Structure formats: C-alpha cells, structure tokens
Amino acid sequence: MLKKKKTEVYALGEHISMSADKARRVIDQIRGRSYEETLMILELMPYRACYPILKLVYSAAANASYNMGSSEANLVISKAEVNGGTTVKKLKPRARGRSFPIKRSTCHITIVMKDISLDDEYVEMYSLKKTRWKKKPTAMPYRDMYNSGGLWDKK
C-alpha cells in the first residue's frame, strides 16, 4: 500500500490576549500568500496583532522544514483562521462601593501551510494556467464614443 506524503503543516496559537476581530484584520491580508511575502507584510503592518501571527508563521515554517524537509521558498499559507477564545471577566472597583465589569477577550489562531512542490494539484493548476500578455482591445465605434445621447445632442 502506498503511503501518501503529507503536504501540510500547521501551527496553533491558543489563548492569545487579543480580540478575534483585530486578529482577523491581519489574517485576511496574509491568507493564500507565499511565506516570504507574508513575512514582508507582517513586518511592515502597524498592528499589534502582527507579532503573535508572525511568530506562528515562523513556527509553521520551522515545522515544515523539520517534519517534511521542505524549503521555505515552496511554502504557501493555505488556511489561516481566527476563532474566539475564552473571555476573562474581572471587576474594577469604582467610587461609592460600585464596580464595573472588565472583559479581556482572547482568541485562537491557526496557520496551515502547504508545500507546493509536493502538492500535485497545485503544480498542475499553475502549469496549465494561461498567461495573458495583452488585454483584449475594446472596439468602440467612433460614433458611439462621442454620440452617447447626452446633453450635447439636444438644442
């Protein structure tokens, strides 16, 4: 029986002290991109969520090189998701014996990377893809270009 070689590795970050919506803003920018491109994007973005996501991307790449022996040039982020974690609820004491609730939200981040050199479907898809060097000319007749039936036709 032939054993299929694994093409995906993942890194999981749980209970990261950050809102899931703020982490999703960054995750949406890196989903589907290559490893080098992801590192450039995360290092230049000005959000606090970039640092834990950058650590997870590094960890997933290290898992790929250690477990599968693949190079970092062939890695692509195939799946990246953010789920809400537990919410830590505390009470802040206020004046006159009152208290206000404080909610610290956490999130779970999952980064899945795929090695495109091992994935047959990915290689076939990009080898069969047709490149378009020139745009198709839009043939618009001269009379339609300037005679659109606007205000200039009426007297």
UniProtKB/Swiss-Prot annotation:
Subunit record text: Part of the 50S ribosomal subunit.
PROSITE patterns reported for this sequence: RIBOSOMAL_L22 (PS00464)
Annotated Pfam families: Ribosomal_L22
Location in or out of the cell: Plastid, Chloroplast
Keywords recorded for this protein, A-Z: Chloroplast, Plastid, Ribonucleoprotein, Ribosomal protein, RNA-binding, rRNA-binding
Function: This protein binds specifically to 23S rRNA. The globular domain of the protein is located near the polypeptide exit tunnel on the outside of the subunit, while an extended beta-hairpin is found that lines the wall of the exit tunnel in the center of the 70S ribosome.
Family membership: Belongs to the universal ribosomal protein uL22 family.
Name used for this protein in its record: Large ribosomal subunit protein uL22c
CDD domains, per the entry: Ribosomal_L22
Gene Ontology BP annotations: translation
GO cellular component: chloroplast; large ribosomal subunit
Gene Ontology terms, MF aspect: rRNA binding; structural constituent of ribosome
Main location: plastid
